[in-house]
Amino acid sequence: MSDDLSLAKEWAVCRPNDQNGWVHAFKVTDPNLSVLDFQELGVLAWMAELMKHRDAGKSRRFNMLSQKFIAKFGVDSSGCDIIRGWRANASYFYIVTEFVHDEIDVDILEELLMLGGLGIQYCIKSPRAFAALSKVSGYPRPVAYGEYNNRYNERDRQARDRMDELISGPANKAVRVMSTLVEGDA
């Protein structure tokens, strides 16, 4: 979920099937839900959360280091109602894969996650949170495939180009990488 209507429309038609999509809008009616905000916890906690739930090729290296990384930087998200963090679609999981292979310095991780302006996503996690959702009047609304799929693809292309530039550029020192963070005192 996103609070950015334009991004939600792009995500509604990001599939390559030439079909129009739908965007829905909800509001949360329970102000007492627990929200785990990874922007407050930091990029390393977010990376650990992604590693818990996404496949980075399941290489031997990933299997060896990810559990240590999760133990060191992860947080217990099991008791929260809503998770707030950087958008983590499949194209951006490339960042995690490169991080696992020590190709990305931690100093550029947050900048990489912000490329493409994908913003923040919300994960409604608990039954209590789902029960607290109410539909906003006037939704769902149709989303034109041609317009918003083109926007999605252009945003993705620009972000991938910028990722490649940043990863291969001078800002990426590749010194404070996953293996050094796991083994060191970072």
Show the residue positions of the predicted features:
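Extended catalytic/binding region for NAD+/ADP-ribose chemistry, centered on the ART fold
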Residues: M1-R15
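Conserved NAD+-utilizing ADP-ribose enzyme module
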Residues: C14-A25, T29-A186
